[in-house]
Amino acid sequence: MKCAVDIESRDVEEMYINIDPIQAGGRLTVDAMKAAISFADGYSVCDNCRSPFRLDYIQKPPIAQFHADLAAWLNMDTARVVPGARRGFQAVASTYVEKGDPVIVTSLAHYTEFVAVEEAGGIPLEVPKDEKNHITPDAAAEKIEAVILEFSKTPPLLFIDHVDYQFGNVHDVAAITKVAHQYDIPVLVNGAYSVGIMPVDGKALGADFVVGSGHKSMAAPAPSGVLATTNEHAERVFRTTQAKGDVTGRTFGIKEVEMMGCTLMGVTVVGMMASFPHVKERVKHWDTEVAHSQAVVDALLSIEGTKVLSDYPRQHTLTRIDTRESFDKVAQQHKKRGFFLSSDLKKRGITGVIPGSTRVWKFNTFGLTEKQIRHVGESFVEIARENGLNIV
């Protein structure tokens, strides 16, 4: 079925159990879908925009209150909605990083952190991960010391992923921010895989900035996200424009420079708002989500030769798995080669594993029911057994 000329309707979530690593937390709630239809027109939320003419002041729909609620929920002082987590990184880097500045990221950082630093003219420098694929406070301290020695200046910013995208490991952010603050380095916590998925307390983490992704982890349309900060940094990162036209003398009120005035002017912000009550509730059930993740991982580990590369026992729903000694051995002899796995999963109503992947790959079980979790685990085992792999 087509939803428009040459555009096929998407039915992934309706027809399959989706374990795609980046899509699980962004499934819209029913309320968000209804809001998306109602506010689909471009500048739809601007119907009742009145002086001082800025998104976070709009009362109807209650966008102003939503901003306050976001900040309180994250235990931060101020928040803004942004077009994806990457725009949060960009806003902070643009504010704090000057040309030639060394900026601390990690060897597990998302590429958008590098790009944000690069765009600001900074030089991204990585804290190495340890043998367990973790970023440690000691490694952060060593890197900071080395950077100060090399550049004769203190880095203006440190990025740390709360949960990294490569392994889905939860890092000791509070300890790392404590180290950074000993050098007076502000810390941006990338919560793209945690905000909206699991409980996040920005001040308990010691964060100067918490960035979340609406479309990755808050059941919101893309592109959407949140940038939250403390009173110490709000005035600087959310500074208002001082520009003035030299011919017209025009000024632009309280438009914020890093937000380019306003950010999410329609379906994205209202979708976030509509899902927010559900998102606040679902993070309270994080233990159940982790148990579900563990159940699928254990099913995979029952297949001889399979290894989990993420932390074990699991502490998150995003997992990196190594099946080079199991499913990939089948792929070498199978007529479909590596595509047999995604094909066999699809026959069982499961999607999200990249077609052709039988070596090292990721999946995400977030949001699945107990019954769906059981089906996913059993399906992996059945496929293994049907293809001659041993179950231990």
UniProtKB/Swiss-Prot annotation:
Source species of the chain: Methanoculleus marisnigri (strain ATCC 35101 / DSM 1498 / JR1)
Protein's UniProt name: O-phospho-L-seryl-tRNA:Cys-tRNA synthase
Annotated Pfam families: Aminotran_5
Subunit structure: Homodimer. Interacts with SepRS.
Required cofactor(s): pyridoxal 5'-phosphate
GO terms under biological process: translation
Function: Converts O-phospho-L-seryl-tRNA(Cys) (Sep-tRNA(Cys)) to L-cysteinyl-tRNA(Cys) (Cys-tRNA(Cys)).
E.C. number: 2.5.1.73
